[in-house]
Amino acid sequence: MSLYDDKYLAIANDILENGYFDNNRTGVKTYKLPHQIMQFNLEKEFPILTTKFVAFKTAVKELLWIFKDQSNSVKELQSQNVKIWDEWMMEDGTIGTSYGWIVKKFDQIDKLIDALKNNPQDRRMMINLWQIPYLDSAPLYPCCFLTMWDVTDGKLNCMLVQRSGDWGLGVPFNTSQYAVLVHLLAQVTGLKPGLFTHVINNAHIYENQVDGLKLQLTRKNDAYNAPKLWINPEITNFYDFTPDDIKLEDYKHHESIKMDVSV
């Protein structure tokens, strides 16, 4: 069994059994637990679910859209057959002053790469998407809003802080795509991938996702081993990565589980 299936499903079960039944801004009630944490050694295993199919290529495209393209254009994603931001697209075809727009405005990727190469013991290395003056000019506040970076013994470690974690849909995407980001940055800075810690402040399951999570829990004992992540070893510039340079090898998984997104 993959370590991610084990940790993810344990928290899913805990939320279903012990979560607080709560209202929220979407109007769809949730079962929620605060302060859930998962940690992975990326040298040993790539974290992705096998107890259901995760659209890895879509997750990679979104990741590159945010951090490489530094874009807020939903139409750019649509041109790649990615529709996960359609519900939040504004009249101008963007998501306003959020995600990639914030990365670009504050030159956050270039500053991080420079620090990783030239001052790896810096304790101030982070990417912060929670920029208060720009929150209200976007249709959705960033969910995954902070990454903190550390280099120890030649290994790149990352902590991802997520204010709100949709356990059925968002969290599996976010864990895998930010684990990819660690690998990409490690490769272009001459480091090895190390620890990846995913902290979710509000971990929740929407009531219309309960049956889907219960179905997934029945597959726990039939989970597969984690796949291997392949990254094109020829790429040394972060901005040269394309989705074709990032692949999973031997990704065995169960069938998809349809769940509704709450807007």
Swiss-Prot record:
InterPro entries: Thymidate_synth/dCMP_Mease (IPR045097), Thymidate_synth/dCMP_Mease_dom (IPR023451), Thymidate_synth/dCMP_Mease_sf (IPR036926), Thymidylate_synthase (IPR000398), Thymidylate_synthase_AS (IPR020940). Pathway: Pyrimidine metabolism; dTTP biosynthesis. Its main location: cytoplasm. The keyword Cytoplasm applies. GO terms for cellular component: cytosol. (6R)-5,10-methylene-5,6,7,8-tetrahydrofolate binds at residues 166, 262. Keywords: Cytoplasm, Methyltransferase, Nucleotide biosynthesis, Transferase. DUMP binds at residues 25, 123-124, 163-166, 174, 204-206. It holds the Pfam family Thymidylat_synt. One of its GO terms (molecular function) is thymidylate synthase activity. Homodimer. PANTHER family: THYMIDYLATE SYNTHASE 1. Catalyzes the reductive methylation of 2'-deoxyuridine-5'-monophosphate (dUMP) to 2'-deoxythymidine-5'-monophosphate (dTMP) while utilizing 5,10-methylenetetrahydrofolate (mTHF) as the methyl donor and reductant in the reaction, yielding dihydrofolate (DHF) as a by-product. This enzymatic reaction provides an intracellular de novo source of dTMP, an essential precursor for DNA biosynthesis. Belongs to the thymidylate synthase family. Bacterial-type ThyA subfamily. This is Thymidylate synthase.
